[in-house]
Amino acid sequence: MAEAAGEAGASERDPDAVRARRRLRVLSGHLLGRPQEAPSTNECKARRAASAAGASPAASPAAPESGTIPKKRQELMKWNGWGYNDSKFLLNKKGQVELTGKRYPLSGLALPTLKDWIQNTLGVNLEHKTTSKPSINPSEAPPSIVNEDFLQELKEAHISYSQDADDRVFRAHGHCLHEIFLLREGMFERIPDIVVWPTCHDDVVKIVNLACKYNLCIIPIGGGTSVSYGLMCPADETRTIISLDTSQMNRILWVDENNLTAHVEAGITGQDLERQLKESGYCTGHEPDSLEFSIVGGWISTRASGMKKNVYGNIEDLVVHMKMVTPRGVIEKSSQGPRMSTGPDIHHFIMGSEGTLGVITEATIKIRPTPEYQKYGSVAFPNFEQGVACLREIAKQRCAPASIRLMDNQQFQFGHALKPQVSSIFTSFLDGFKKFYITKFKGFDPNQISVATLLFEGDREKVLQHEKQVYDIAAKFGGLAAGEDNGQRGYLLTYVIAYMRDLGLEYYVVGESFETSAPWDRVIDLCRNVKERIRRECKERGVQFAPLSTCRVTQTYDAGACIYFYFAFNYRGISDPLTVFEQTEAAARDEILANGGSLSHHHGVGKLRKQWLKESISDVGFGMLKSVKDYVDPSNIFGNRNLL
């Protein structure tokens, strides 16, 4: 981010720099209006030369890297857990849970009630800790199988690569529980043989052509945040497996302020994209929970959804144009028109393809001016059912905020346990008064309360009008305004919740989240039945302590909603916790489908859920997908075996 940081510094010193930069980007948008004209072949060569300058192609680049994700990811991110190396939940010297580092609003703050919540909810004994491997042992990694002719041509193309064990292991997995558990205690049976780092579209074309020439297997990787086994290497793959890492394709190529679009390389992370657009006064508004690490190409290939989709749309609503390199050649449309009637939409063959057809290299996406005003809120309901009814009415009246999330009671209790220590006596008094007012004066049962968090953004006057409309609807369903602070805190927790699983693993707790979508008339029954199924399955499989089984409604639509489930259990006394966990999760998925839910709302299918795909889309639909795969990639070069 050296270039972006330099631009930001210049803008602070000279306001004219902002205007000048914006004018240049507008001009670039007109001059480079067609994606195929940017970047130029010479630019591609220059980036490759810089990447390999002064060293062999296998070495780290001499030039500064511009994106958040470096080539050596392990220098910044955990190799066997979620997120940044400097951020983790632990027990501090006072015996309180604390998040280390300085990256998040919660960092460095004590969470005085979380320890008791963990002990009481999951039966955890904090005197008993698990052990995990401190680092990757290169001797434990499967040996690299490399085609020497391919390697020689890769060197001649000056495309950076690595055969180091730590680089290969880091790209052998996503973030499913099974994958992280294996990293802590064992090793994968099969990992990539080589990691390659293209720096532009032309590099990807060269790599794919070489893979076709020598019949090699390619598994693309972006942010590495997959939760569907999407990155796991097939154990019986005998060909050289190439991990094609797009993280160095991380530029905004142009911004067109007339058409409100931006053309970007597909390896740019969400946080880099939003930060750079913000410098020019724009945003995409696409904010998945994995925003820090996930990339544009990954969003497209999994049909991602962001928490503010009510205003900005899901990824399929944001993409105007895209370019994909396949074994048959490059797929892209000839026009960037906003809508076309040219048969089935080619974009929808690419969206959701999960790395099985090719590599997405560039995309044109819609942008919007950065909202001038943002306001948080929260509403407490007597129970979950009343909350769901309220969200249904808000959706019916087409007045949903940018984001609205409804937590069931157990999720509400968990969120309350994540509340930082209060330093102000007055604030503590106010919190106590609010609790008294809701539970005693209004008669809410603390064990039934359900809470919705709200995020409004846009023009200030319209936001305030919108806010009043939503709270008026909530009141009709027994909802009470629960404060802006509670709403804001709920959203600030978004990017730290994933760190909680690593803490659990240290104390014999396995946990996971999964999602679905369902029609409104199925939401309540589905939530109840799935949570009950999880509890029943755990009991039948010998789990000694009642599991955490909870849910929340995270997104709303005219015809239904997205529902997230969270479950975890204490596995002390269980000889094979992974099998118990996976059988329970599979049973929960069966229950979801039996209750009218979808196979996935936005996580995708991967290898984890593909056993249910044919049932979900019909034999004919499955055959259609297979026919596309067979034509586009007849030799199965993109052989991650997701979906089919």
Swiss-Prot record:
Swiss-Prot/TrEMBL GO biological process terms: ether lipid biosynthetic process; lipid biosynthetic process
- Top-level EC class: transferase
Cofactor annotation:
FAD
Q: How does activity depend on pH?
A: Optimum pH is 7.5.
Residues that, per the record, bind substrate: R501
EC number(s) given by UniProt: 2.5.1.26
Q: Quick check: keyword Lipid biosynthesis in the entry?
A: yes
Name the segments for region: Important for enzyme activity.
601-603, 640-644
Q: Which residues does FAD bind?
A: 220-226, 289-295, 302-305, 354-360
Could you name the Gene Ontology cellular component terms for this entry? peroxisomal membrane; peroxisome
* Biased composition, class Low complexity, residue ranges: 49-64
Query: Which pathway does it take part in?
Result: Glycerolipid metabolism; ether lipid biosynthesis
Q: List site positions: Important for enzyme activity.
A: R405
Transit peptide region: 1-44
- Disulphide bond pairs: none
| Source species, domain of life | Eukaryota
Modified residues annotated as Phosphoserine in this record: S51, S56
Q: Which GO terms describe its molecular function?
A: alkylglycerone-phosphate synthase activity; FAD binding
Role played = Catalyzes the exchange of the acyl chain in acyl-dihydroxyacetonephosphate (acyl-DHAP) for a long chain fatty alcohol, yielding the first ether linked intermediate, i.e. alkyl-dihydroxyacetonephosphate (alkyl-DHAP), in the pathway of ether lipid biosynthesis.
Q: Quaternary form? A: Homodimer.
* Descriptive protein name: Alkyldihydroxyacetonephosphate synthase, peroxisomal
Organism for this UniProt entry: Rattus norvegicus (Rat)
Q: List the taxonomic lineage.
A: Eukaryota, Metazoa, Chordata, Craniata, Vertebrata
Gene giving rise to this polypeptide: Agps
